[in-house]
Regions:
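Beta-hairpin "wing" of winged helix-turn-helix
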Residues: 56-76
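N-terminal helix-turn-helix DNA-binding core of bacterial DNA-binding proteins
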Residues: 2-47
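Conserved beta-strand edge residues that scaffold enzyme active sites
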Residues: 25, 68-70, 105
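Amphipathic alpha-helical recognition patches that constitute DNA-binding helices
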Residues: 9, 21, 36, 72, ...
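Residues within the DNA-recognition helix of helix-turn-helix
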Residues: 51
């Protein structure tokens, strides 16, 4: 019997430039449609299609096709996909903290789907620290105005 390494397994499920973003997008909006997601995320049709197929294959999302004209397809999280969201949130918080510590620019659009109250305080603290590193003159002005 060949054993499967759990780290490799989960990494395979979420590897891909857009998979974690897609999962959070679905979690935030409840469901997504292909063209809206392509436009919102700015991802190519080919890449989005492939990522959605892989996420569906791995059981993290479900593709729902409506027999309408024109054809309507939506994607929702499965219970397995929902179970993964807290772990992705932890990775996201770590990543934002790390980017801020490296003083790297953080995509503001990435915050749109990460505004749940349980993480908002952490994100705001990190962003405040990040902004102070980016604009130290704002701290000096703030200190002067409070005196």
């Amino acid at each position: 019997m060949d054993y499967v390494n759990p780290h490799h397994f989960v990494t395979n499920c979420i590897s891909g430039k857009w998979k974690m973003t897609i999962l959070h997008h679905i979690h935030h909006y409840g469901k997504i449609r292909f063209n809206e997601t392509k436009k919102t995320l700015g991802v190519s049709e080919k890449v989005l299609s492939q990522q959605l197929k892989e996420l569906t294959h791995d059981g993290l999302i479900e593709r729902i096709q409506y027999n309408t004209i024109p054809l309507k397809v939506e994607y929702i999280l499965t219970p397995l996909g929902e179970d993964l969201i807290p772990a992705l949130d932890i990775l996201y918080i770590w990543s934002v903290r790390r980017l801020a510590s490296l003083n790297l620019p953080i995509d503001p659009d990435a915050f749109k789907v990460h505004t749940e109250m349980k993480y908002e305080d952490q994100l705001m603290d990190i962003m405040d620290t990040y902004k102070h590193k980016q604009h130290p003159e704002a701290d000096a002005n703030e200190n002067v105005s409070h005196q």
